[in-house]
Amino acid sequence: GTGKTPMTEYLVETLRKEYKTATLSRGYKRKTKGFAIADQNTTAIDIGDEPMQFHQKFPDITVAVGEERLVAIPQLLHQQPETQVIILDDAFQHRSVKAGLNLLLTEYKNLYTRDLMLPAGDLRDVKTSRKRADMIIVTKCKSDLTEFEKNELIKEISPLPRQQVYFTEIVYAPPYHLFNAAKKADIGIGSDILLLCGIANPKPLMEFLTKHVHSYDMIRYADHHIFTIDDLKEIKKHFEKMQSTNKIILTTEKDAVRLEKFKT
């Protein structure tokens, strides 16, 4: 929930302009095993929702999955030898991989300095590992973060002299139709939203909707939830009960790739 996916997309968008770029992910909750590269027939079931999202948004790059990164990297380079940059979206804890640049993401409202290791907290590595980072990026910051607040956060993070600290925020683009990306949805202060959400940390989206729409109800699912026909029936029933003439079903990009299988 630190914002790895939007950061990966930002890096892809930036790097693919000059370098042959690839992403390599574990492919969490996919139904396949081993190494695979996405093609025109690939679905979220094959590679996982986040890699599928990358594949849909950036069809010109290589999107690969593999549980063992150390094994998958040479396989990727063998099949795509022109690759110049590989972005691993969740590999900081994989010490066997010697990355050219290590980025450590930590959420503004839940800095790693205040967190604990799994299962007591959300950390996947010991706090001392932050020394391996080249850059520390504080994600999901509020838009009006002051210089004083930034300096206080930097003091808490206590970076090494060689480490740079950056601050980012989430800016939501206009929503679009699930099966027609060119068709934009018009939501605003008069809209009543049914939010379908199966991501690790929906709080930033909930805070955004609280400020920008009339009201919202949320059906919450587990992260990487695989939608079923019964889920669709529940969604339809909930939506029909909403007493509004300006209602809309809204979901995240990551959830959307898992809903596309229902396209008719």
Can you name each region flagged by the protein language model?
Residues 1-40, 143:
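Walker A (P-loop) phosphate-binding motif
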Residues 27-161:
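Phosphate/Mg2+-binding loops and adjacent switch elements
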Residues 25, 140, 252-254:
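Short secondary-structure boundary segments
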Residues 20-24, 104, 192-196:
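Conserved beta-strand elements of the Class I
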Residues 111-245:
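C-terminal accessory "lid"/substrate-recognition subdomains
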Residues 5, 54, 89, 133, ...:
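Residue-level signal for inorganic ion chemistry
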Residues 78-84, 239-247:
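Glycine-rich phosphate-binding loop signature in dinucleotide/nucleotide-binding domains
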Residues 242, 247-248, 256-264:
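Generic C-terminus detector
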